[in-house]
Amino acid sequence: MAIDMKAIHDSQSTLVMGVLNITEDSFSDGGLWLAPEAAKAHGEAMMKAGADIIDIGAESTRPGAKRVSEADEKARVLGAVDALIPEGAVLSIDTTRASVALAALEHGAQIINDVSGGQLDRELPHVVADHSDCLYIVQHWRGWLAGAAGNVPDADTSRYEHGVVNDVHD
């Protein structure tokens, strides 16, 4: 069974995060957990195997991945959140969209995992800031993975005008 948020905040040891990809084109599982029932079963299995946190991602970030619609991402995420919250899961939501993060937090998710470092949706850090109990995982980002030509961008496409910490701190 997953641990509670107080234990996560106070933890002095390593925690295990299980990854639940609910995408059609995941590089790691090829869409095995896209159906809500499959997502729930896999999330429960990871919890039973010792995962402290389940990280739900509904949009692939593999090289060359194409964006899914906001509505599709939100529907996938909320289906998984609504299935796993009653099971006692601590949920991390892997998203770059403020609207998806907000909806997931309102449905009980506790952590936002932003692979864009706040670069893709400038409102996302504000959504997290408005939820004081929410943890925010901020990652460095090289730009959207599928550019106009479908190629991976150069490392210098990330722009943090005032530095990473200052730009996401507010």
Residue map of PLM features:
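Alpha-helix-loop-beta-strand connector modules within alpha/beta enzyme cores
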Residues: 66-93, 99-102, 129-141
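Active-site mouth loops of central-metabolism enzymes
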Residues: 22-41, 66-67, 92, 153-169
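N-terminal amphipathic alpha-helix/helix-capping segment at the start of soluble metabolic enzymes
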Residues: 1-24
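Conserved, mostly hydrophobic/aromatic
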Residues: 20, 46, 50, 54, ...
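Short beta-strand/loop segments at the ligand-binding rim of alpha/beta enzyme cores
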Residues: 13-16, 85-94, 110-111
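Conserved anion-binding
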Residues: 24, 61-62, 107, 115-170
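Generic structural signal for well-ordered alpha-helices
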Residues: 43-44, 77-81, 101, 122-125, ...
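Glycine-rich, proline-tolerant flexible connector loops at the mouths of alpha/beta enzymes
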Residues: 26-28, 52-79
